[in-house]
Amino acid sequence: MQNKAKIIIPLVVLVIVIVSIATCTGNSSIFVQWEPVAIQNSNNSIKLKVYIENSGSMDGYMRQKSEFKDAVKSYVNALDLKVDTTELYYINTQISSFKADIAKLEEALNPASFAKCAGSRSNSDIADMLNNIVMRTEDNSVSMFISDCILDVPQGDAVNFFGVKQTNVTRTFSKALNKHPKLGVEIIRLSSTYQGMYYYAKGCEPIESKRPYYIWMIGNKELLGRLNKKVALTTIQHGYDNYVAFSSTTNVPFDIATSLKKHMIKGNLNVKGQYVFDFMVDMSETLQEEATLMSSRNYVSSTGRNVSVSGVENVKQGAEYTHILTLAISKNTKPCSETISFAPPAMPTWVDEVNDDSGRDIRKNMNKTTGIKYLIKGVSDAYKDNTNLATIDFRIKNN
């Protein structure tokens, strides 16, 4: 009996030790529990309002076969097929309706048509134009603003001038956000052959070269997101150079494909010993371009290192969801509530790189735009409290 006891006692101790080790090393499985956030498939009508600046500085883009005309025509036509109504306007100090329909858009893009419109073509205040456009943007409409976005620097204190314009733009969009909290803004930088007069505060000179111009898309982020899912930026003929967008925080529509029971799923172990989960998400309302959405560095866990986005996969254009996020959760993670936030950099570096502060010597600044960073930073300041563009909420459980 004593010999049996000597054998049994060590075996019991060994079993206890093994169980203890398994428990302490977090050998339990990781589950995720969630409540799906549904995609809002709205059938509400969308009205597209296109505003083309017709100040004198825009004439140089209007030559036959210019990239400007090709790009505007291709993008407006593609969007027109996805909206219910499209309205065309010229804009300078006043807003004038086009005397042509979409089919004849290219014919209307010429200096002669521009000159027939009301308002002053001799000077342009982009901040005022943006204010007029934003005030006319409704919950069911998307406004497209096409302009060279040059701020006409007066003689004197240019720094103060730019600061005033930036403040004016911030005020415009801050007031609009108070009224329309879902307002979003996309700014696309493009380039085109330019052949015409370049205007300074005093005088002008002829140039023939590639020059930048901009397309702004302003409207309810849900509508902008819907249009982006149907009409990609790659639709624009000759492509685009740069992009930046601003939006309020979105509780991202998401789901997980399969589960053991309702809204709960066990993760699969990867080679690193982490439990992984694939989340189907619709990131369209963030308005960010694909490179930003595909960077896992822009996704942040609220609980720290134990949870991370290890991969991002895009879904084909036109699908209900836009991306698949792969989440990796360490096996020793304790049960908790978790939030994944999408927090990309607020301002891309290109905004400073393409800006000109002088308003002089265009031949040394052919690829730059006078004052553009102050317009864009004016918009950015209106959205400064929205550091997270999207959130995904769920719970981590284990057995």
Where are each of the predicted segments found?
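Von Willebrand factor
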Residues: 41-147, 151-152, 185-187
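Short, compositionally biased P/S/T/A/G/V-rich stretches that sit at domain boundaries
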Residues: 223-271
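VWA/integrin I-like adhesion module and closely mimicked acidic/polar interface patches used
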Residues: 150-210
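Well-ordered, non-membrane alpha-helical segments in soluble/globular domains
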Residues: 64-75, 114-131, 157-177
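Acidic, polar low-complexity linker/tail segments
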Residues: 4-49, 56-61, 390, 394-399
